[in-house]
Each structure stands twice: as C-alpha cells, then as structure tokens.
Amino acid sequence: MNSEAGARARYEKRKRQRVYIYIDNIEPQSKKMPEAERDKFQEAVAKQLTTLKRATFTGDVALKIDLATTSKNAPQAHTIAKNLLDLLGVRRSNVKWPRRHLLYKDDRQIQALSVSCRHGEISPAISIGAQPFGAMLDDLELAAEARRSIEMSSDYFYEQDREADWIKTFRDLIDHETNYRRSLGGDGYDAYRNMVRWYAQRAMLKSSGVTIPVLNWMYGRPKDITTGFGQERWASLIRASKIRLQVGELPITKGSSDVFKQTVSKEIIAFKNRWDWLINPLVVSVALEVIVRPNPATPTAVLHDLDNIVRDYLLPSIVPKFGTVSDHRWTIDFNELQRTNPEIAKSWGANPMPPPGTKSGVTRYEAWRLPAVVGEPGFVSVALLADVDATGDHMDEIDQSIKAWASHSDRNYRY
C-alpha cells in the first residue's frame, strides 16, 4: 500500500468514479411496467447522469440496486431487477440523451451484482450504485488488508468458536431430547430448543459465505505479493465446502440448460440431506451469495449475465425447497411476541407485515464473477447467508472495513 495516507488518498479518488442514482417517485416494477413509466425511469437516470457529468460505462462494472416497493401486489425483487437492468442499458426512443446507452452498453459488463428489496414501504425508492469493476477490486484489496488485523485477533477466533458452539449445543439437544425434556419440562425444552436453533442456524449460515480476504485472494489479489497459495486453490476450497450448494458448470451448449437445472435440484436434495436437522424449518432470513467462474471455453455470445444465473437457475429451486422469505419480519411470530412482550410488539405498529404476496424470496442476492482459469473447469457455488445482523452485502462490508481502518489510522496518527 506504500503508506496508509497514500492508500486512503487512492481510495477517495476511486470513490469519485462511482455513480449514485436515486429515484423516489417511481414504483419499482417488473417487465409489466407501463411504457410511460419506463420512459420516466430512463429520463430520471439520464437527468442524474447529466447532472453528474457522467457518460456510459464502457468497461466492466460493479452494480448495486436497493429497492423499496409500496404496492400490495409488488412483484418479486428479481423480476424488478430484470426490468431495471434492461432499462439501464439501451436508451428508449422517446428519451432525450445524447448516447445510445445510459449506464452501460450491455448487462454482461456487470461482474459483481447486488440486489435487495423491502416490500410494504410507505414510499417507493430505487437506489442504484455503480463503479468500474477494476476500482471495486482495488477497494476489495484494501478492505482485505484492513480486515487482516481483525481476523487475526484472539477476539475474532473466540467469537468463531462461540458461534460453532451453538451448532454443537443444538445437535446435543435433539440427540438427547428425552433427557432434556425430563430435566427442563416439555415447554422449557421447546422454548430453549427454539432459541438455540435460531443461534445455530445463524452461526452455520454466516460461516457459509466467503470472507473479504478470501474473495480478494480468489481474484488473485494482491498481484505483487506471492502467497504460495494461488487463486485457483482458494476457489477449489470454496468448491469443496459442504455448507455451500455446489451446482457445477453453467450451460454453454445447446440443450444443456435443463441438465444444469437438474443438477441444481439434485444438489439441493443432497444439501438438505446433510443439514435439514438444523435448517428445517428455517427460522432466520437468508440472502444468496453466488460465486461464478465461467469455463474458459465459454463463447462470449453465450456468457450468462449474473442476474440471469440467479433468476432463471437458482431462485426457482432454492426458494420453494428451503422456504426462504423476502423479509426478516416473516420469521417473527407477532402473536407470540404480543403474548410475551406486548411493549416490543406495540413498537412494531398495528400492521408490521409486508404484503402477503411478497413473502417468498430472499432478502438479497449478490453474485460475483471470477475470471476463467485456463485448464480449470468453471463452477457455480452458492451460499445461503443468514441475513440478520444488518451488515449488508460484500460491497457494504468493503466500505465499512475501510472506514473502520481509516478511523483507526486517524486515532493512531493523532495520538
């Protein structure tokens, strides 16, 4: 990094390459969005790009979309994202803008994508953040260095051990249920098991995701330091993880899509056979983390865009098979909360739930595309991440890690 001051200066310079678009007068909609609303959305994007004096991205992009819907019949987040991703590309004929494209030329430029949505809000919102993917990788490298001191501390290792203990405790509870029921009583056992299940699921599903340093190493960063453990080795470790869904290579030949979908279904069955004792039923809300490495023989014309991978191949099987929900509020028993703690129940308001039709889904999905490796197969690896700590996606985590590191550096500099 040469120096901490230099690293911070370069980070601030990269931040100026980012584009932020915020629209609060258009309801997020799927492809059924009226033509006039589509024009209105593109006009808003064009206006903000003009104000920012920004042109169309021509290279690889990291993209983040946050949505808020108000409609009682709001579509699922991935169908909204599909519509918006298309609208961020080719300019519609009625929209005034000097270029043929708006934010980017083709959504296959997107190498990292994050989509989140909250339904049942008071006001609609569409928030879009974009930056050159190369700048994102530089941020990732800085964040990985910032995380190193945290993840090498004794407190961090103690926290990891404590999290793992919840899983062991839950396994012990179900293996020795008769003894525990005798000592705790039926109601006492049920209440304790439910509490431990929540913490155990949270621990297991948190650990299934890749950390910032590992993500950094999988991209071959830092480039100028030999670690003795190449990026393909880190990818192999992720591919071998039993707490992730390993669904093989993306289809790149005619007729192979159905085979890939069957592979996804088979892997879900195998995963549930290993973990249903812990995750069925799911009592925590989850997000999806998808790591994709294409086969080096993939023709450019058939390279799958990241949203297509999640929308067409993963969500249709994962959501119904695991019973995932789009909002953590669906995991709360408000009747039980009213009985046990009426004050907290009251603080949620008279009608705390999102519209019923929006229940199925995930709280967020993010996908990262690794570069192909000559002589190595492609793969798709998926983690169901516990989304209960308000930590956000990896893009948020990168900025938060750098912010914490910079704050610590400031204190050291002053004192």
Residue ranges and their predicted role:
Residues 1-415:
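Acidic, proline/glycine-enriched N-terminal capping motif
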